[in-house]
Amino acid sequence: MIIFTDGKINIGENNILAASNEELNSLAEEGVIEKRKDAIGTYYYLEDESQGMRFGVFISLQDRKINWVRFSWLDSPCKGWEDASQKAMMDEYRLLSNFLENQVGGLPDSKVNRKTTWRFNWGLLEVSYEPRAYQADIFMKFQ
């Protein structure tokens, strides 16, 4: 379960975002989350939902700590380049922004060029839209 206001993803009793690299490795060995590698390095992946919206969750590490988490909406109407358009991505960006406003229970602290940000004690919660990649995502960035 994703709890955006607390900066948490709970699997059972465990908050995986408070987990160490070793604990994430252990969860990957148990098959709870996936450990993946790309050109940049190792990251973890899982699928979870919040208020009926399904997300692909990418957990990026830096210096053995969680650096950021990206939430990609799995039910996006844009499944590939042939589905993508400026209007579709702006609609998705607005949908994700409104979704977070409802989840957080308040207006964002900052709204500038394709980025909407809420500030919390644990860090930042953002919705951003990258027009060159036709991608709108939610990010958690930890302090």
Indicate where each model-derived feature is located:
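Short helix/turn-capping signatures at newly exposed starts of structured segments
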Residues: 1-116, 122-125, 130-143
